[in-house]
Amino acid sequence: MYAYVKGKLTHLYPTHVVVETAGVGYEIQTPNSYRFQKHLDHEVLIHTSLIVREDAQLLYGFSSEEEKDMFLSLIKVTGIGPKSALAILATSTPNEVKRAIENENDTYLTKFPGIGKKTARQIVLDLKGKVKITEEDSDSLLQVDATSTVQDQFVQEAMLALEALGYSKRELAKVEKTLNKNKYDSVDEAVKAGLQLVVS
């Protein structure tokens, strides 16, 4: 129904962003909202997919068409909901997920929150041969530039983002200690570092 939303990015939250267009603010769930940090208070285009449930209508947004297509493929798999699909795409590019599927790399897929061995196997069974690996993923429309900000804030916001993706506080306790030992130029960088730690 909504192929994309183009407008001013007004807010960033751990699980979603808000884009204002024609006087309406659209709440859009994203894999990693801090990818959009550079564009806060500026115009942005986000590829979207509307999912209607009995209790809600949720808009999901992505920085590229490849990412959106991968999300739509994942949620067709039995046992994979939008939240799990977002968690996978928060840490991996579409091509990385496709390679794991084509190579039947269940171990790679089970690193994500909510994805056990049975679900990983189902992803492979349902999607192998149906997802095309491109030569290179389309450049993200949203590249985050390094900015100088308070390190503690970066880490705190990164931890909120990781918790929103479904990782437990126990899993994140060690991650937070490691993140606090390093310096980051953006929340997105801290989130990416945290994701690498939690899935390693």
Curated annotation (Swiss-Prot):
Role noted for this protein: The RuvA-RuvB-RuvC complex processes Holliday junction (HJ) DNA during genetic recombination and DNA repair, while the RuvA-RuvB complex plays an important role in the rescue of blocked DNA replication forks via replication fork reversal (RFR). RuvA specifically binds to HJ cruciform DNA, conferring on it an open structure. The RuvB hexamer acts as an ATP-dependent pump, pulling dsDNA into and through the RuvAB complex. HJ branch migration allows RuvC to scan DNA until it finds its consensus sequence, where it cleaves and resolves the cruciform DNA.
Region (Domain I), start-end ranges: 1-63
Flexible linker: annotated span: 143-149
Family of this protein: Belongs to the RuvA family.
Keywords: Cytoplasm, DNA damage, DNA recombination, DNA repair, DNA-binding
Free-text note on domains in this protein's UniProt record: Has three domains with a flexible linker between the domains II and III and assumes an 'L' shape. Domain III is highly mobile and contacts RuvB.
Main location: cytoplasm
Tree of life domain: Bacteria
Cell location: Cytoplasm
Protein name: Holliday junction branch migration complex subunit RuvA
Gene Ontology molecular function terms on file: ATP binding; four-way junction DNA binding; four-way junction helicase activity
Region described as Domain III: spans on this chain: 150-200
Family annotation (InterPro entries): DNA_helicase_Holl-junc_RuvA_I, Hlx-hairpin-Hlx_DNA-bd_motif, NA-bd_OB-fold, RuvA, RuvA_2-like, RuvA_C, RuvA_C_sf
SUPFAM superfamilies attached to this UniProt entry: DNA helicase RuvA subunit, C-terminal domain, Nucleic acid-binding proteins, RuvA domain 2-like
Subunit field text: Homotetramer. Forms an RuvA(8)-RuvB(12)-Holliday junction (HJ) complex. HJ DNA is sandwiched between 2 RuvA tetramers; dsDNA enters through RuvA and exits via RuvB. An RuvB hexamer assembles on each DNA strand where it exits the tetramer. Each RuvB hexamer is contacted by two RuvA subunits (via domain III) on 2 adjacent RuvB subunits; this complex drives branch migration. In the full resolvosome a probable DNA-RuvA(4)-RuvB(12)-RuvC(2) complex forms which resolves the HJ.
One cellular component (GO) term of this entry: Holliday junction resolvase complex
Record-level GO BP terms: DNA recombination; DNA repair; SOS response
Region Domain II, residue ranges: 64-142
Protein source organism: Staphylococcus aureus (strain NCTC 8325 / PS 47)
